[in-house]
Amino acid sequence: MADIIHVMAREILDSRGNPTVEAEVFLDDGARGVAGVPSGASTGVHEAHELRDGGDRYLGKGVLKAVENVNEEIADELAGFEADDQRLIDQALIKLDGTENKSRLGANAILGVSIAAAKAAAESAGLPLYRYVGGPNAHVLPVPMMNIVNGGAHADSGVDVQEFMIAPIGAESFSEALRIGAEVYHALKSVIKSKGLSTGLGDEGGFAPEAESTKAALDLIIEAIKKAGFEPGKDVALALDVASSEFFKDGKYHFEGGEHTAEEMAKVYEELVAKYPIVSIEDPLQEDDWEGYTKLTETLGDKVQIVGDDFFVTNPARLQEGIDKKAANALLVKVNQIGTLTETFDAVELAHRNGYRTMMSHRSGETEDTTIADLAVALNCGQIKTGAPARSERVAKYNQLLRIEQELGDAAVYAGRSAFPRFQG
C-alpha cells in the first residue's frame, strides 16, 4: 500500500460564512485525498473541541492555529505512514494531541486529516469511499431525513424545536425518496406563502416561518405532504430534532412560553406521537438527563426512535452508558463530535451490536464535502440527515447518494420503513 508523503491544510469558508479547515493528504503513488470539516451551531458540551483562533479576525472564528497544527506537527508525525492503516493513523493523531477532547491540536485539524487519509487510501486502492470503508456488502441506501422547517438555533423564528424533518419511507428507491422529498418541500413553500408567513430559509435550507407552535409547524408539513399528493404516515413520515439543551435553563425546559419539567416534556412528546406520524425524536431532553432518557425510552421507545445527538456526541463511552441504562435507542452520527473516523466506526459498531439504530448527520455549518454520504452507505446506517433538498452544500450529499445508488445498480437496497421501530413486528 502507498505511504503518506505530505499532509497540508488551509482555511476555507463553510456554508454559514465562517472559517473551517480543509485538509489534504498526498501518497507516494500520486493518490490524494481532500476533506472539508463541518461545524455545528447547537453543540453538545461533551463534543470534541473545535479549535478557533479568537481575536478580531473573522470575529474570533478563524482556524489558522488548527491549520498550522496540520501543516507542522501532524504533517511531521504522519510522514511515512501506510495510508490504508486508518486505525493506526487515527491512534497516532489522538496520541499526538494528548488531550481527552482533542483540544490541543483541535478536533477540526485531526478530523480533516483523518478523512483525507481515508479518501487518499480509497483513491490509491481504486475504490469509491463507501466501498473502501464498508467492503463488498455496503449496499443499503439511507432514508433521507430532510429538514424542511428550521427553528431553534438554526433560524430566527419563534419555533423552539430546531428541526422538523420528513422521511420518505414509502419510496422504493433512494432516487424516488429524494423526488418525494423535493416535491413536498416545494409544496410546503406554497402552503407557507398562502398563510402569509415568511418563506425565508434557515441554516440547513428549510423554511423558517413564524409558526405559533410545534403543532402549527407540523400541521403545515402535513398539509404540504397532502398537497404534493402523498399520504402522511404511509408515503412520508415526520421526525423532530428538539435540541432541548438549547432551551434548558435553571433546571427547567423553557418551551413554548412555559417552564416545564422532564416529565411534562415527555407528556408533550406522547401527545405529538399520538397525533402525528412521527418516527423519530432527537435530543428530546437535556444532554445529561440520564434518568429522564431512560423513562422516556421505556414509554415511547417501542413507537419511535429516541435519538441521542448532544446526549451521546458520537462517543462510544457515552453510548455504552446509554446502552447500560437503556437510555435512548438510536445514535446520531456526527464525525466531528468525536474527531476521527475510527472512533466514529467504533460508535456505530457498538450501536448496531446493541440494537440501536444509527442516523448519519451533517452539521449546520457545512462544506461541499460529501464524505457522510459514503459513510452512511459504508456503515449501513439506514438513515441520513443532511438538510433540505436545497442549498448546494446539502444537495451535494444527496447527489452523491444518487451516484452511489446508480453505481450499485440492482444490488442497491433502499432502507425505507424498515429503518424505524414504528414499523417493526
UniProtKB/Swiss-Prot annotation:
GO terms for cellular component: cell surface; extracellular region; phosphopyruvate hydratase complex. Pathway: Carbohydrate degradation; glycolysis; pyruvate from D-glyceraldehyde 3-phosphate: step 4/5. Its EC number is 4.2.1.11. It is an enzyme of class 4 (lyase). (2R)-2-phosphoglycerate binds at Q162, K334, R363, S364, K385. InterPro entries: Enolase, Enolase-like_C_sf, Enolase-like_N, Enolase_C, Enolase_CS, Enolase_N. The active site is at E204 (proton donor), K334 (proton acceptor). PROSITE patterns: ENOLASE (PS00164). GO terms for molecular function: magnesium ion binding; phosphopyruvate hydratase activity. GO terms for biological process: glycolytic process. SMART domains: Enolase_C, Enolase_N. Its main location: cytoplasm. SUPFAM superfamilies: Enolase C-terminal domain-like (SSF51604), Enolase N-terminal domain-like (SSF54826). Mg(2+) binds at D241, E282, D309. The keyword Magnesium applies. Its cofactor is Mg(2+). It is found in: Cytoplasm; Secreted; Cell surface. Keywords: Cytoplasm, Glycolysis, Lyase, Magnesium, Metal-binding, Secreted. It catalyses: (2R)-2-phosphoglycerate = phosphoenolpyruvate + H2O. Binds a second Mg(2+) ion via substrate during catalysis. It comes from the Bacteria. Catalyzes the reversible conversion of 2-phosphoglycerate (2-PG) into phosphoenolpyruvate (PEP). It is essential for the degradation of carbohydrates via glycolysis. Belongs to the enolase family. This is Enolase. It comes from Corynebacterium aurimucosum (strain ATCC 700975 / DSM 44827 / CIP 107346 / CN-1).
